Amino acid sequence: MKIRSFVAGVTLAIATAFGANAETWRLAVTDVEGMERLQLEWGPFKEALEAATGDTFEFFAVNSRTAAAEALRGETVDFVVSGPAEYVVINKLTNATPIVGLGRPDYHCAIVVRADSGINTVQDLKGKKIAFGDIGSTSNMLCPMQVLADYGIDPVNDVDKIHTSRNIAHEALKAGDVDALGSNAGSWLRVRNGETDLPYGFFKMIARSGDLPNDMIMVGAHVPADAAEKVQKAIIDNKASIIAGITAHEENDKYVGMDLVEIEDSAYDYVRAMYSNAGYPQFDSFIGD
């Protein structure tokens, strides 16, 4: 009886000590609106995160990028999953910093034209009409504009630009209503590969970017550095289970084949250059909001 009591006491003491060291954090995802979608699409990730850290994570739903920034600034959310373009603005507004990069395979953009267009180089696009994706998107707007700038074309003044959905841009290029499109390369290829009635060489990519900076998990400036480092280490040390949690739902298929890596703010300087070349040199507000 005494042995049982002793074992029970030790178990209780360990559990109490573990619980005393555990924290409760609030977690947001910038491109997922509503608690129901958060639970469905990111619930397995939250569970894996809790298992890896021993902490509790509570979802905090945000309905916009601005709301995520305000929540970080108001210290009502602690960790945020976001993309590179969003991070650059949120960092400027709140001093939040990245702790883990969500390395996506084949995450780059491309400039695409029709093969029969007579357009062979990026310089040939001066004065032409180009379709870009959603305003403010890293890979569908900012990145292709940066590619133009890298080749000496001012994306603000040297081209006639429109913004539309990827599918509409693809149809417009196919019909000759635009001269080129700038898009996330992998996403456009999935649309292109569905066009089984078109010959293989109907389109051509005349330029592509390098691999883009990662999506990331960022931490609010109010979170103690040692606590942020603890979460970072737990994620990296348990990356297999964390990745399995992220990719459990089909809405996160873009992360299939991903890696989790430690990352620093300087990795996003290229995105800051994108903002500047797109005509937003202050990067202190979200484009399109």
Model-derived features: where do they sit?
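Pocket-lining segment of extracytoplasmic ligand-binding domains
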Residues: 117, 129-227
